[in-house]
Swiss-Prot record:
It is an enzyme of class 3 (hydrolase). Keywords: ATP-binding, DNA damage, DNA repair, DNA-binding, Exonuclease, Helicase, Hydrolase, Nuclease, Nucleotide-binding. Pfam families: ADDB_N (PF21445), PDDEXK_1 (PF12705). Belongs to the helicase family. AddB/RexB type 2 subfamily. The gene is rexB. It comes from Streptococcus pyogenes serotype M49 (strain NZ131). This is ATP-dependent helicase/deoxyribonuclease subunit B.
């Protein structure tokens, strides 16, 4: 064995490549070993350093791949053992054990997390060269007993099913120990680069290779100063020193110092020396030189998005200077936090990149389909799971529009659970769903699922056969082929499909002769699919490489950007979680030789120093280290390592907001420039410097000129939210000439509430999702129907009997039976409605001086100027003197307010008066009013009553009164009825004013509607809060930002309020 170390200013790869070339020139076969995470990059680096740029004598690979070169022909033809297969084997082993057999883990037998931990422990034992019987000294002896039972049973199953229990390295080591590879290894030289520690498995293999190979050469970075130190605790080279010292002591050799022809920039060497002096308690009498600072940058940004944008702009600048994408490396402090943001931003700046991290398959449609299938079976046909299966695009041959219609109906009819899915759809609504088509679709969905889900506990082989038959019926394979739209998607689909078929094969192999339930089968398949990952290879070598910073090696690229280096992530604190604690691992390691667990937490300090050292030397030309003040929406501090660099004299540059400028990095890329022009068009120029204002104003002026030539424009508005008028063609279709515009009191109220709401409801005809469950609309229909029946009954029956009959016959109507007898909640709602009817009905019995002459009266009111107002009057009453009035039933409290009417928000009663005047063409003297009747079950606070007497009854009836607009002429006739006339009496002239102003409201609204421009203007009564419908989800209206767009209501003092509003009405309606 030969141990080589060198300073950070030299290239260890060049030194080892020279050693490899010498061996190859002598006729030896050379294996150049690199860590798993670096083998691809190391291969490219090694081939670059070879004069001939390639050779068959030097193979750059990993330990695992090297073992296959030697054992591929002699390895036994056994089944491959991966993580999913291991999980299935442990699941089967736990199935065969009873809870009382496992005192410590009996309650976790079916826990998926526990099974994952068993898989990890088993793999750790293999890597550590340990068996389960070596787990002595655990905190609880029963833990070892339980683990022995589980793992021994699992290993028995592996033997029975002919699975290969040995890892590739174990098979390689066994072949070496048996002398099967002596001739080959005697002509082999092994060169190892990039390691600072070996696992127990690698350590054991290395001892065998050292005894059998021609030579083993290992290189590592250690400074001469550090190598001569006797005390190395806390030294930045501590990990490498321990690594070399352990090997030197074990193999009785002395490491040699070597240098390379390539020497990197002195700036990085000087920074490394300062870093080393800080941690080895020595001092230096010099500082970084001024020109050294040109190679380092410390950035501080506010948040991640700005940080990534600054990096992207800097990369564009490097390209402008003539560098290539492959010369740039981006390192992430927190891979999970940055992974979702960095892709879209790099795409915006047109920067091709390769993210060096396996991508989980969890978002693939096949994985989502399997998960939805398993949940559908487990949760008894839950609607969301059935719909997710359909939306995956892998179930049957359904168009998106068909799936949308099916989803809409199942939500309306509240279809959930097997019982409802298995029965034909019969309930319909005003939208007239195509029940015949939906039932055909329901059968296509239900029949294959029902056939699969009815499977009882049986052999695993039989379950797999039924599952495959189900997948054929729904055309899963054909649908998978239709998913791909690009070559990358085709490759991903192939990986997912292979993973899926491998899992089915493993399940059939392991559980083929075991009886288990379908739910267990689907759960195991789902777990295997969700844990799988894509292995994507970059389509080209000229890309920006992105990976986690702790995987970096010295001198990786000319330009390196390390971002997200906050205190929480740099350094990283790794803590192991599993079935064994770190303390238990440490006790086991004390009594083993060549066999030991890796304890990450025990090596955090020296590993982090090693990582920081590699990071500070990762670039050969320029290193940028960046930290955001906010990461994952949490404030974080500077890394202690970055604070050290600041103490060395490196300035911390506050990059601030990503302001627009005319630098090459801003305007040299089309997509980035376009996105910035859009951004600047939305913001105020006052945020910029004068020079920037002039530049961007000129750019926008030129852009608008070019857009005008192309008949395009950049919209401008004084408001944050703006709407466009409808085109002439759309206006002609929506509001054709010669056809009256149809309005109603409700439509008018919506218009004056928020014009855009009118556009959505009455122009686009958008409706809220319907539901079979009773809501306020259906409750109102029920109450109207009962009172309509009651008032039509002119028999001599007692009033209470009439009421009972009206309730009974209304409850027997098929629509109300479907609505109110569907479940206990609906039945409870019906009981409340019946109480409301019984409480409100007595008011009808008391008013014996009125006669109901019509109910549910439809009307069409011609307002002139091609405006037709339509509606339904609930009830028309006639007093003893022949005067007419209207009653509108309400399920909530309502009363007429002249101010609300003036602002267009309460036109209903006046509109009904106008319609009644048209229906019964009499003088206005014969109209006694229009009123609301609140259908309610009055609630009284008994604490306010000293005793139960007539005052209690009077209070109940006081709540049951008619409230609205009443003619002053008829007040004598109204005084004997349940009419609340206080402050509600109007003279004939005042009634005429109300009617004329009501017409004016309709004409004004119709004129605006026909223009086709609808504003986002919910009303505000005080200018501080918005009461109108804001439609935030659609309009993004924010009261604090868009108050200027709200319509301010006219409000007047309470004193003389009525007279003042009437005066305004006369003025505006030109009376």
């Amino acid at each position: 064995m030969k141990l080589i170390y060198t300073e950070m200013s030299y290239s260890m790869t060049e030194i080892l490549v020279n050693e490899a070339r010498k061996a190859a020139d002598q006729g030896y076969r050379v294996f150049y070993i690199a860590p798993n995470s670096l083998s691809f990059e190391k291969e490219r680096e090694v081939l670059t350093l070879l004069p001939e740029r390639g050779t068959f004598s030097i193979i750059v690979t990993r330990f695992v791949q090297m073992s296959r070169y030697f054992t591929v022909e002699s390895s036994p033809s056994k089944q491959h053992l991966d993580d999913t297969t291991l999980a299935m084997i442990f699941y089967r082993a736990l199935m065969q054990l009873k809870p009382e057999d496992l005192p410590s883990y009996g309650r976790l037998q079916n826990n998926s997390v526990f099974i994952e931990q068993l898989v990890e422990l088993y793999k750790e034992l293999k890597n550590a060269q340990l068996s389960v019987h070596d787990l002595t000294g655990l905190d609880h002896p029963q833990k070892q007993e339980d683990l022995i039972k589980i793992i021994e049973l699992a290993e028995t199953i592996m033997i029975q099913q002919d699975y290969n229990q040995d890892s590739p390295l174990q098979s390689f080591a066994r072949a070496i120990k048996l002398g099967l590879l002596n001739n080959q290894l005697s002509k082999t030289v092994v060169v190892i680069d990039g390691f600072s520690r070996f696992s127990a498995e690698e350590d054991y293999l290395l001892s065998l290779l050292n005894n059998n190979c021609q030579e083993v050469i290992i290189g590592s970075y250690v400074s001469q100063k550090a190598y001569q130190k006797s005390f190395i605790k806390g030294n930045i080279y501590e990990a490498s020193l321990h690594f070399l010292q352990d090997l030197a002591q074990k193999y009785h050799i002395k490491p040699v110092f070597a240098t390379s022809n390539q020497v990197f920039k002195p700036a990085f060497s000087r920074l490394t020396q300062l870093f080393e002096a800080t941690h080895d308690f020595s001092q230096v009498d010099w500082q970084l030189q001024k020109n050294d600072l040109d190679h380092f940058s410390l950035w501080q940004c506010h948040h991640q998005k700005e940080e990534i944008e600054h990096v992207a702009k800097s990369i564009r600048q490097k390209l402008y200077e003539g560098y290539r994408y492959k010369d740039i490396l981006v390192l992430l402090g927190d891979m999970d936090a940055y992974q979702l943001q960095i892709g879209p931003i790099f795409d915006k700046f047109e920067i091709p990149y390769y993210l060096g991290k396996a991508e989980p398959m969890a978002a693939h449609p096949l994985v989502q389909f399997i998960e939805s299938l398993e949940r559908s079976q487990r949760y008894n046909w839950r609607r969301e799971d059935i719909l997710n299966m359909l939306k995956s695009g892998l179930f049957g041959c359904f168009d998106d529009s068909d799936i949308d219609r099916f989803e809409e109906y199942t939500q309306f009819a509240d279809i959930k659970g097997f019982t409802k899915f298995s029965k034909p759809f019969t309930i319909n609504s005003s939208r007239q769903y195509p029940l015949d088509f939906l039932n055909e679709m329901r059968q296509d969905i239900v029949l294959p699922l029902q056939e699969l889900f009815k499977s009882q506990k049986q052999l695993g082989a039989s379950l797999v056969d039924k599952l495959i038959l189900f997948l054929k019926k729904i055309r899963l394979a054909e649908n998978m082929q239709g998913l791909a739209q690009s070559q990358l998607e085709v490759e991903k689909n192939e990986e997912v499909w292979k993973r899926f078929t491998d899992i089915l094969t493993s399940f059939h192999h392991i559980f083929g002769q075991e009886k288990l339930r379908l739910s267990d089968c689907l759960a195991l398949i789902k777990t295997g699919m969700k844990s799988a990952q894509y292995r994507v290879v970059p389509a080209t070598l000229d890309v920006v490489t992105i990976k986690s910073y702790d995987l970096v090696q010295p001198h990786s690229k000319p330009f390196v950007y390390a971002i997200g280096l906050t205190q929480s992530h740099f350094p990283k604190q790794i803590h192991h979680s599993g079935l064994l604690s770190d303390q238990e691992r440490a006790r086991i390691n004390e009594i083993r030789n060549y066999r030991h667990f890796d304890i990450a937490s025990a090596e955090n300090s020296k590993k982090n120093h090693q990582t920081a050292l590699s990071l500070f030397n990762a670039a050969t030309k320029e290193l940028v280290l960046s930290v955001p003040t906010v990461i994952n929406e949490t404030f974080d501090d500077l890394s202690p390592y970055l604070k050290e660099l600041i103490n060395f004299g490196l300035p911390l540059l506050d990059k601030g907001k990503n302001y627009l400028s005319y630098d090459n990095s801003d305007i040299a890329n089309y997509k980035a420039l376009l996105s910035q022009i859009i951004a600047i068009n939305r913001q105020d120029l006052i945020e910029m410097a004068d020079q920037d204002k002039m530049f961007w104003t000129g750019v926008l002026r030129y852009l608008r000129k070019q857009l005008r030539k192309q008949q395009l424009e950049l919209p401008t508005s004084d408001y944050r939210l703006s709407t466009k008028p409808l085109s002439k063609e759309v206006i002609e279709v929506c509001f054709p000439k010669g056809i009256p515009l149809k309005l109603s009191a409700t439509a008018l109220t919506v218009f004056y509430n928020n014009q855009y709401n009118y556009f959505l409801k009455y122009v686009l005809n958008l409706n809220k999702t319907e539901s079979i469950h009773p809501d306020s609309r259906i409750h109102g229909q029920y109450l109207h129907r009962v009172f309509e029946r009651l008032m039509k009954d002119h028999t001599q029956e007692p009033f209470d009997n009439k009421l009972k009959q009206a309730i009974y016959h209304t409850n027997q109507e098929s629509f109300f039976q479907q609505v109110y007898q569907d479940n206990a909640e609906a039945e409870y709602s019906l009981a409340i409605l019946e109480d409301i009817v019984r409480s409100t009905a007595p008011i009808l019995q008391l008013n014996q001086n009125i006669q109901v002459i019509d109910q549910e009266k439809n009307f069409q009111l011609d307002m002139g100027n091609e405006i037709l107002v339509h509606g339904i009057i609930d009830r028309i009453d006639q007093l003893s003197d022949g005067s007419l009035g209207i009653v509108d039933y309400k399920s909530s409290a309502n009363q007429f307010d002249i101010g609300t009417f003036y602002n267009g928000l309460s036109p209903q009663l006046v509109t009904y008066l106008a319609a009644l005047k048209q229906i019964a063409p009499h003088d206005i003297n014969q109209l006694f009013g229009a009123m609301y009747l609140h259908l309610q079950d009055p609630k009284l606070d008994l604490v306010t009553f000293k005793q139960i007497d007539n005052t209690l009854v009077e209070s109940i009836y006081k709540a049951l009164t008619y409230k609205g607009i009443f003619s002053e002429v008829e007040k004598e006739h109204l005084s004997t009825g349940a009419y609340q006339t206080k402050n509600a009496l109007y003279s004939n002239d005042e009634l005429e004013t109300l009617l004329n102003y009501n017409k004016y409201l309709y004409l004004k609204a119709a004129k605006h509607i026909k223009k086709g421009h609808f504003l986002i203007n919910p009303y505000t009564s005080d200018g501080k809060t918005v009461q109108g419908d804001q439609l935030k989800a659609i309009t993004r209206f924010e009261a604090d930002l868009d108050m200027g767009q709200a319509r301010r209501l006219v409000t007047l003092p309470a004193k003389e309020k009525k007279e003042c509003f009437l005066t305004l009405m006369r003025k505006e309606s030109h009376l």
